[in-house]
Every structure is written in C-alpha cells, then in structure tokens.
C-alpha cells in the first residue's frame, strides 16, 4: 500500500472527479455547519461508490447536546442534505462507545448521486475543486488550463487555491 500526502482545503479537494472508490471522514465535517452542502458536493464529485462519514449526529443527540452543537456551529441534517443533493443514505449506524455523550457519533453510509462523467482508476491531482489536471515538473505542480502553479515543499504538494501562483507567462507559446 502506498500513501501520498498533500495539503488541501476540504472545500476544494484537488482530485479528479470520480477517482476514489470509497471516501471516509471522521469528524472532519463536524465544525463546518454552514458549509455542509458545499463539502458534500465536493465529496460527491470525487466519490465513485461510497461515502462513509463518521460524524456527530444532531438527530440522535439530547436537547443539551443539540444546544451545544448549535452553539458550536456543528453540522446537522446530514441525511436530508444528502438527499437534496441526489445522494442516498443507505445506513446510519450509531457508534456506541463515544468519548463525549453530548457529541454522539454515527456512521453514515452514503451512495453519491449518479452522474455521467469520466471515472478514473486511480487518483489524479487537479486544480482544487475542478477536474483540470495538473502536471508535476519536479518543483511545482502546474495547470496548463489555468496557468496556476502549486508549490511542492519537502515532497508534499501544497494544493490550496490561496497557495497557487499565477504564472501565465510560463505557458505562452513562442
């Protein structure tokens, strides 16, 4: 098994659409209540078969726990939001052993919406949140489509939009 790490923003995943068979998350969506729909859309974009979310369950929580989640801006209504976006929650499994009873975790097993698009056998880096492929020139990852360069520091690609460098001159034809 090989592992490639990169730095990215969860709102703009720098992978080509439909290139990951099973995507998982463990409390990564939790503090992003205002961005749940945006995050689900991008997760659906890259997921081929299943999205498995281990996230707090507002619906399974107590009144005190719901108040806490509301005050912290945590996500809620995962099932409803998934279905609005065309996905399907096939199972919700409450996790019995939780460290904080005011933050009960559930495992949401989700099928992403069916869309006609190119699927890839393996992950390919792209301009964050898009399917514009980027190429590795050793020092940078570069997009001929957008003119953006992304730095590589100590072998780790930094694939955040706010870290990109606009370098159109690098792509001009003589």
Walk through the language-model features, giving the residues of each.
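Short alpha-helix
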Residues: 68-96, 106
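Hydrophobic adenine-recognition pocket in adenosine-nucleotide-binding enzymes
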Residues: 28-29, 56
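A short, conserved alpha-helix within the catalytic core of class I
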Residues: 31-42, 46-47
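Short cysteine-rich clusters marking metal-coordination/redox-active sites
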Residues: 125-130, 142-144
């Amino acid at each position: 098994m090989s592992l490639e790490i990169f730095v990215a923003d969860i709102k703009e995943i720098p992978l080509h659409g439909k290139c990951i068979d099973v995507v998982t998350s463990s409390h990564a969506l939790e503090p992003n209540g205002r961005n749940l729909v945006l995050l689900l859309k991008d997760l659906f974009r890259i997921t081929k078969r299943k999205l498995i979310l281990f996230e707090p369950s507002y619906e399974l929580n107590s009144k005190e726990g719901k108040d806490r989640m509301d005050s912290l801006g945590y996500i809620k209504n995962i099932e409803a939001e998934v279905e609005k976006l065309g996905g399907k929650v096939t199972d919700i499994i409450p996790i019995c052993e939780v460290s904080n009873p005011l933050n009960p975790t559930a495992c949401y097993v989700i099928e992403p919406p069916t869309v006609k698009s190119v699927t890839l056998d393996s992950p390919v880096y792209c301009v964050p949140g898009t399917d514009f492929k980027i190429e590795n020139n050793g020092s940078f990852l570069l997009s001929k489509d957008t003119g953006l360069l992304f730095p590589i520091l100590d072998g780790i690609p930094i694939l955040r939009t706010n870290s990109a460098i606009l370098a159109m001159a690098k792509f001009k034809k003589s």
